[in-house]
Curated annotation (Swiss-Prot):
It comes from Bos taurus (Bovine). Residues 165-194 have a biased composition (Polar residues). The modification N-acetylglycine is found at residue 2. The modification Phosphoserine is found at residues 133-134, 201. GO terms for cellular component: nucleoplasm; nucleus. Residues 10-87 form the RRM domain. This is RNA-binding protein 7. Residues 25-35, 59-76 are annotated as: ZCCHC8 binding. RNA-binding subunit of the trimeric nuclear exosome targeting (NEXT) complex, a complex that functions as an RNA exosome cofactor that directs a subset of non-coding short-lived RNAs for exosomal degradation. NEXT is involved in surveillance and turnover of aberrant transcripts and non-coding RNAs. Binds preferentially polyuridine sequences and associates with newly synthesized RNAs, including pre-mRNAs and short-lived exosome substrates such as promoter upstream transcripts (PROMPTs), enhancer RNAs (eRNAs), and 3'-extended products from small nuclear RNAs (snRNAs). InterPro entries: NEXT_complex_subunit, Nucleotide-bd_a/b_plait_sf, RBD_domain_sf, RBM7_RRM, RRM_dom. PANTHER family: RNA BINDING MOTIF RBM PROTEIN -RELATED, RNA-BINDING PROTEIN 7. The modification Omega-N-methylarginine is found at residue 149.
């Protein structure tokens, strides 16, 4: 394989570009898929940039991954269209694989899409795609956040870092929701007897929440009646003593009155 063919395998064609898109912006965008050597936007005779560009990667495996990750992303409201460069081995594999799928009987319009053809590439490309397939949506969001931030502030395009700030709030909310649901479920699953035991463990709960009759409800009827009879017995003795005292006082008075008459 010659040097030109090797460079073609590491290059992507990016079309449908807005006139505001610059080489620095494309460098920052495609750097999310792997190390980028250079980005070239050709110009016409008048010096105006054309609506397509070439992105050259350092590693060949970054080419199919960049197509799967960034194809269709909108820049300034216009979705970009990524294709393999003509003459590369990726483009020839895409053409050769599209015909067997068509003759098998799969008439789906997405049978020849880049995402389907990438799955049938070399084992190294398949391994990379499988390793990133689970986090593809997160990486696409991170790429757009990074690009929008660069476009908003107009900063210099250097070595990019994935913006992970969009992931932490969802993780915290999930943890918070899980903690609330688990705590509420624990409160619902706790038996009522255990809650009563915890309430009765406080030394003053009984005095606060129960009246005198409820506090003495555990006493036996015999003991309660015995105490009540004792009080009545004392009352009867007191009444009997006062009655005898009144009789003696009355009899004494009557005796003196009788003695005085005689």
């Amino acid at each position: 394989m010659g040097a030109a063919a090797a460079e073609a395998d590491r290059t992507l064609f990016v079309g449908n570009l807005e006139t505001k898109v610059t080489e620095e912006l494309l460098f920052e965008l495609f750097h999310q898929a792997g190390p980028v050597i250079k980005v070239k936007i050709p110009k016409d005779k008048d010096g105006k940039p054309k609506q397509f560009a070439f992105v050259n990667f350092k590693h060949e495996v970054s080419v199919p991954y960049a197509m799967n990750l960034l194809n269709g992303i909108k820049l300034f409201g216009r979705p970009i269209k990524i294709q393999f460069r003509a003459g590369s081995s990726h483009a020839s594999q895409e053409v050769s694989l599209s015909y067997p799928q068509h003759h098998v009987g799969n008439s789906s319009p997405t049978s020849t899409s880049p995402s389907r053809t990438v799955d049938n590439m070399t084992p190294s490309a398949q391994t990379i795609q499988r390793s990133f397939s689970s986090s593809e949506n997160f990486q696409r969001q991170a790429v757009m956040n990074n690009v929008l931030r660069q476009m908003s502030y107009g900063g210099k395009f250097g070595s990019p870092h994935l913006d992970q700030s969009g992931f932490s709030p969802s993780a915290q909310s999930h943890n918070h929701t899980f903690n609330q649901s688990s705590s509420s479920q624990w409160r619902q699953d706790t038996p009522s007897s255990q809650r009563k035991v915890r309430l009765n463990s406080h030394p003053y709960v009984m005095d606060r929440h129960y009246s005198r009759e409820q506090r003495y409800s555990d006493l036996s009827d015999h003991h309660y009646r015995g105490n009540r009879d004792d009080f009545f017995y004392e009352d009867r003795n007191h009444d009997g003593w006062s009655h005898d005292y009144d009789n003696r006082r009355d009899s004494g008075r009557n005796g003196k009155w009788r003695s005085s008459r005689h």
